[in-house]
Amino acid sequence: MNIQSTIKAVAETISTGPIPGSRKVYQAGELFPELRVPFREVAVHPSANEPPVTIYDPSGPYSDPAIQIDIEKGLPRTREALVVARGDVEEVADPRQVKPEDNGFAQGKHLAPEFPDTGRKIYRAKPGKLVTQLEYARAGIITAEMEYVAIRENLRREQDRPCVRDGEDFGASIPDFVTPEFVRQEIARGRAIIPANINHGELEPMAIGRNFLVKINANIGNSAVLSTVADEVDKLVWATRWGADTVMDLSTGRNIHNIRDWIIRNSSVPIGTVPIYQALEKVNGVAEDLNWEVFRDTLIEQCEQGVDYFTIHAGVRLPFIPMTAKRVTGIVSRGGSIMAKWCLAHHKENFLYERFDEICEIMRAYDVSFSLGDGLRPGSTADANDEAQFSELRTLGELTKVAWKHGVQVMIEGPGHVAMHKIKANMDEQLKHCHEAPFYTLGPLTTDIAPGYDHITSAIGAAMIGWFGTAMLCYVTPKEHLGLPDRDDVKTGVITYKLAAHAADLAKGHPGAAMWDDAISRARFEFRWEDQFNLGLDPETARKFHDETLPKEAHKTAHFCSMCGPKFCSMKISQEVRDFAAGKAPNSAELGMAEMSEKFREQGSEIYLKTE
């Protein structure tokens, strides 16, 4: 594989520049004036006499036309200076060197190119120093990352601006306005996390927590049979362009290390991984050959690269495995099945559970967050809410306290496949046993009958559990259960889950959520077609669907669409009724009613009139 051809392939496929109808804007910090917090701004037609609409924007520098993108150099490491300025980190004098097993022993033309060495420094905590966002928060310190998050969450709303709180939040504590101090308090209590490895200098900080906007994650990554560096970097940029707040690299084939390096260096969103996948590649795919030393080495490798959160299946304990024997679909988590196989082969307790304190100490030195994996999640609605699932969940609650003791941030992973009437119980159990640590769920899928449409079956459950309190939703694409998603599948999954997350925010009564809906509703009623397109989650698709039947520019000002036509448009008729009422005398309605009443009496006061 030629490195220059690979770079060229990536550069030609990624999308840059703003989303149609939008522009990139920034807001500076007050505590940290050097901060530039990004937003997507959509200006509406002057006839609306309305201010622009501000939308949360995780797309990074790629949507800013003023920034020159060079994939080979990676994104600017603007956060690095903030991390170093705190004085709590030191450069690693002897960073870990890349080994053949890190890339699955790939050689020659099968070895993906390394990310070019650009002089990046690798850091870890100084002995005895605070370095995690949780430790800073507990010490009463507001970090630059915390102010950054507060600004992002407010969507440029002013603190004294009145807001409408129309929703049911099920006991959450969502404020009218997010302050840096509120962010600090939520982090200190463990109710939110800011996944932000000190070695991810390219990161634009974000928060995951019940009292913040619901976030979504997109999964990418190669497999043993498909995908390249170019494919995965392109998917990363594409996913964040359409709204992915974090991205997980779930690569399982060769070249895991090199592909991950390209992804992190070009990512402004937090990157998560499942380290056991790479550890398994290092032992040639034989689960029984896994051991603590290989896993520990993999953790350090990924910490130094800049991975922001790890999914670790430490809750798959030996006593729980027999509980899955009578399930319809058994153990469906890849990480869970790997650890279950190891436990049974050795008839020993899960070494991730037994070595959990040591794992915490490694992660603490780099501020890598836990995403405690649900290795026993249900893979079918028939298996939902069983004893295996909830036994693991209770264990994750115990491990949460251990991680917090070490100063490490934690979120909890959840199911899976759960019918609608069982979803609320999942949220209730998680809050009860996991001490309000953020919940991060895969859907859940609410039915098993729709291969090819599981982005829809899961978005139903995602919207519900997001409303109940889940902090982040892991997307599902149309290819779920069928194959590796391509570029189009990634976009479909992201858009579907942004919709579910926003629906949850709206239902919870998030103070800024309804502003977006109201803006597009007014545009729809006033037939401002361009505003309707531009304010949507996917302006390109909205415009395409409209133009398939009404393609002319004149149709962009028409007071109808192709569904109802000019005579039957309900909104056009409503406008005519409104205009008629506005043009009549104040008592015209009463006079009209009196006229009809007199006519009724003249006809004999009969409800039904006889025909001639």
From Swiss-Prot:
Biological process, per Gene Ontology: thiamine biosynthetic process; thiamine diphosphate biosynthetic process
Recorded catalytic activity of this chain's protein: 5-amino-1-(5-phospho-beta-D-ribosyl)imidazole + S-adenosyl-L-methionine = 4-amino-2-methyl-5-(phosphooxymethyl)pyrimidine + CO + 5'-deoxyadenosine + formate + L-methionine + 3 H(+)
Cofactor: [4Fe-4S] cluster
Keywords assigned: 4Fe-4S, Iron, Iron-sulfur, Lyase, Metal-binding, S-adenosyl-L-methionine, Thiamine biosynthesis, Zinc
Binding-site positions, [4Fe-4S] cluster: 561, 564, 569
Keyword 4Fe-4S in record: yes
GO MF annotation: an example: 4 iron, 4 sulfur cluster binding
GO cellular component: cytosol
EC assignment: 4.1.99.17
Cofactor binding mode and count: Binds 1 [4Fe-4S] cluster per subunit. The cluster is coordinated with 3 cysteines and an exchangeable S-adenosyl-L-methionine.
Record bears the keyword DNA repair: no
Top class in the EC scheme: lyase
Pathway linked to the protein: Cofactor biosynthesis; thiamine diphosphate biosynthesis
Role: Catalyzes the synthesis of the hydroxymethylpyrimidine phosphate (HMP-P) moiety of thiamine from aminoimidazole ribotide (AIR) in a radical S-adenosyl-L-methionine (SAM)-dependent reaction.
Family, as annotated: Belongs to the ThiC family.
Name under which the protein is recorded: Phosphomethylpyrimidine synthase
Gene from which this protein is expressed: thiC
